């Protein structure tokens, strides 16, 4: 959406509307569960920013699977949000995610902001830890090309490629018949 409005009722309830690109006003609940969850997260962070303006404490927020029910593009934008809040307000986030889009976005931001080559001047705010079933957790360090120095376990990054290869094999099999 382009904008939003909140209408309060005697401090007990509220209506939350989202103004879409066409100028239509929609209830947030009609936008889907993912949008609702993302907006609640954003409003909570905004509240903490307001509260923290006076205290100026270093805050670390734990966020569990914020990508649930979100369109891939919004998952990516959520990573932008975490990055901007970190940059502007110094909040740190520990995010548990299974989202390839969010992880890939950290790689892109790290390259765009030159976090990888100039660690002394411009430290990388992103740290990726992969929890491997057999090997246990390990850090996925960024290389200068924006890739990771280690692989994720099977079924994470390679799943899309694996399915594509299976489709190609199936198409070739069907064409041979």
Predicted regions and their residues:
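ABC-family P-loop ATPase nucleotide-binding domains
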Residues: 1-7
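Switch/communication elements of ASCE P-loop NTPase nucleotide-binding domains
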Residues: 7-165
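Conserved helicase/translocase motor-coupling segment
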Residues: 172-177
């Amino acid at each position: 959406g382009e904008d939003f409005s909140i209408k309060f009722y005697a401090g007990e309830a509220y209506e939350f509307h989202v103004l879409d690109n066409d100028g239509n006003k929609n209830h947030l609940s009609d936008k889907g569960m993912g949008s609702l969850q993302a907006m609640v997260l954003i409003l909570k962070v905004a509240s903490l920013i307001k509260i923290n303006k006076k205290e100026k404490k270093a805050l670390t927020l734990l966020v569990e699977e914020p990508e649930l029910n979100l369109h891939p593009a919004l998952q990516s934008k959520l990573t932008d949000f975490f990055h901007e809040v970190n940059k502007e307000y110094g909040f740190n986030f520990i995010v548990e995610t299974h989202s390839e889009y969010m992880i890939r976005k950290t790689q892109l931001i790290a390259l765009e902001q030159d976090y990888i080559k100039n660690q002394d001047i411009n430290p990388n705010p992103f740290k990726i830890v992969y929890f491997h079933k057999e090997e246990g957790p390990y850090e996925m360090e960024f290389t200068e090309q924006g890739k990771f120095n280690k692989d994720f376990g099977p079924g994470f990054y390679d799943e899309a490629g694996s399915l594509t290869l299976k489709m190609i094999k199936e198409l070739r099999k069907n064409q041979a018949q």
